[in-house]
């Protein structure tokens, strides 16, 4: 278990890249999709990740890639779904195809970092940042703010000062959703006020060239359409209100279909229309 606070559901198969690209093209043409985030798990464990990124790039989409980044340094173990190892992925190739590469940093020491992200060391994360900077990547550091690292935000900010390639620091309030995030919620829950205090510390201590992006739990409701490796399209099951409610903390999701379904775009259109209807 690599991340006991993870919100995600992990597919047990991998959808073929041409199918993913057809779906992405459909989202672009029908709904005006402009940006896509490729995440996981860790997308670098996908055998044809560079081919997938090139296909998305050729569609004219803005690509954000979120990865632990270990495979940039050498062969890396597969820690999410599956076993074995993945070969080293060339940072230069990924940087050339990605508009922004997000690397997690959830603490300034291994003791803090590994409360949330078990197998990533600070040394390895800093090595990944250095490698991406040399590759000319635009880098974003992602920090999940939880009860175990609120006192470490200033120290994390100090680590960022050594990298001019970091353009953004995203701070995410821990969300108690998904199979793991909900199960382990008591270990990580943080109030809105404590989150905003952590954001203020980040703004006060971050290097001047780094933009701070604060992502509260309530602010992320109903903002994402998620797709797992098997092609299942889903959203978290949450109340319609824009603020966070206690019932939003659950391990349920709303399954919409699969990217291979012939009517998947129609289903998404129906959901979009239902969400925009205003009662008389």
Predicted regions and their residues:
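Radical SAM enzyme [4Fe-4S]-AdoMet core and its adjacent flexible, acidic
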Residues: 15, 114-115, 119-126, 130-229, ...
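Residue-level recognition of short loop/turn positions
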Residues: 2, 40, 68, 229-231
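Short loop/turn motifs at secondary-structure junctions
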Residues: 2, 32, 97, 164-168
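Canonical radical SAM enzyme core domain
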Residues: 10-24, 41-98, 105-112, 119-124, ...
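Canonical Radical SAM [4Fe-4S] cluster-binding loop centered on the CxxxCxxC motif
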Residues: 1-19, 30-31
């Amino acid at each position: 278990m690599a991340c006991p606070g993870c919100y995600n559901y992990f597919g047990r198969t991998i959808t073929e890249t041409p199918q993913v690209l057809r779906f992405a093209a459909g989202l672009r043409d029908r709904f005006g999709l402009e940006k896509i985030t490729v995440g996981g798990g860790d997308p670098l464990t996908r055998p044809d990740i560079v081919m997938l990124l090139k296909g998305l790039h050729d569609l004219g989409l803005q690509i954000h890639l979120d990865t632990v980044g270990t495979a940039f340094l050498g062969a890396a173990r597969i820690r999410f779904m599956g076993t074995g190892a993945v070969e080293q992925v060339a940072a230069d190739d990924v940087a050339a195809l990605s508009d922004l590469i997000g690397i997690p940093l959830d603490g300034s020491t291994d003791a803090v970092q590994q409360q949330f992200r078990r197998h990533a060391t600070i040394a390895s994360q800093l090595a990944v940042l250095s490698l991406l900077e040399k590759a000319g990547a635009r880098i974003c550091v992602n920090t999940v703010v939880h009860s175990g690292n609120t006192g470490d935000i200033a120290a994390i900010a100090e680590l960022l000062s050594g990298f001019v390639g970091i353009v953004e620091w995203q701070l995410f309030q821990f969300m108690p959703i998904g199979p793991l995030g909900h199960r382990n919620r008591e270990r990580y829950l943080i109030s809105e006020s404590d989150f905003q205090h952590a954001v203020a510390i980040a703004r006060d201590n971050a290097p001047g060239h780094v933009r701070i992006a604060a992502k509260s739990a309530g602010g992320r409701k109903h903002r994402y359409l998620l797709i797992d490796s098997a092609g299942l399209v889903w959203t978290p099951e949450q109340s319609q209100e824009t603020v966070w409610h206690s019932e939003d903390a659950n391990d349920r999701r709303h399954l919409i279909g699969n990217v291979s379904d012939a009517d998947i775009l129609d289903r998404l259109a129906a959901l979009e229309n239902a969400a925009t209807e205003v009662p008389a």
